[in-house]
Every structure is written in C-alpha cells, then in structure tokens.
Amino acid sequence: MHASKYIHPCTPQHALEVGFNLRSEDKREIEQTMGLAAPAAVLQSYYNSDISVYFTSPHGKAVGVAGVTTDNIIWMLCTDEGDNHPHTFVRESRRWVNSLDYPYLYNHVDMRNESHVKLLKLLRFKFINYYVHNGVPLITFIKPCANPSLWES
C-alpha cells in the first residue's frame, strides 16, 4: 500500500475528525444511504475495512479518509480541504488506489456528488449501473486491478 507525506494509516480519531468535517455532498450521501449520522457512518466504514488511510493537505489539515473492505468495497469520504489542493489530492489518491492488492475494487456513489464522480473518472473507475436506493440516485463503479502479484500462488 502506498504511503507518503500526505497518506497515513487511519485511526478511529482520524475517522471521527473527518466525520465531523465532511463535505456537504459526502455528508448527504452517507446519511441518506446508510441512515447514520456522518461521524458514526465514517467510524463504521473505518471499522469495516481491511485497510484504511488518512489523507492530509500540504499544510497538515485533514483531507479525507478512505479504505477497502475484505469484499473489495472501496470507499472515500472527504472534507472541503481537498478542494484547496486538488492536484495533490488526485495524484496521491491515484497512487494509493493503484498500489492496492485487490483483484478489483467497487462501490456506488451518489450521482449528485459531482466531485467524487469526477475523481472516480480521473482514477479510471468504470460506471456500470444506475439505480435508486432510499431516494438517492446511485452509480455503481468498478476498477479491475491487474496486479501480477495476485496471480502468484
């Protein structure tokens, strides 16, 4: 897994910090799809993950948290700080996603969350299914991760 001066192992405290400071689009998405308050939803995502990371800005401020479950479900939730350093955030996100040792990654995103839809496109995820859940318009996305190390037994 890629680590850098902007990507760190996540802790429950990091998850709560981001949960209390989510972008409004991320907050709406998780509260409407998970039925939990934002901090609780972020903490649940953290505890359900096989791995999780904490992204920071060049100024050390929280940008977001992300993780992957044992079922290959990738997730990311962000603060507004990422909007202040978009190139750094996209570059580091790409490095992290491309370093993951999973055969594929998938999840869904609220179609109204334009920043994350754009980020997913930049990270080369493919959109494969549109549906509505709890009144939320969602898009399923997937990315095959052709990592040769996974083929060795």
Q: What does each model-identified segment do?
A:
Residues 1-22:
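A short beta-loop-alpha structural element at the N-terminal edge
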Residues 24-42:
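Conserved GNAT-fold acetyl-CoA-binding loop/helix
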Residues 42-55, 61:
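A short helix-loop-beta-strand connector motif used in the catalytic cores of GNAT acetyltransferases and
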Residues 54, 58-75:
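Conserved beta-strand in the GNAT
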Residues 75-91:
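A short, internal acetyl-CoA/4′-phosphopantetheine-binding micro-motif in the GNAT/acyltransferase core
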Residues 91-105, 123:
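Conserved acyl-CoA
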Residues 105-121, 131-135:
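Conserved beta-strand-loop-alpha-helix junction that forms the acyl-donor binding cleft
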Residues 133-153:
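C-terminal "cap" of GNAT-fold acetyltransferases
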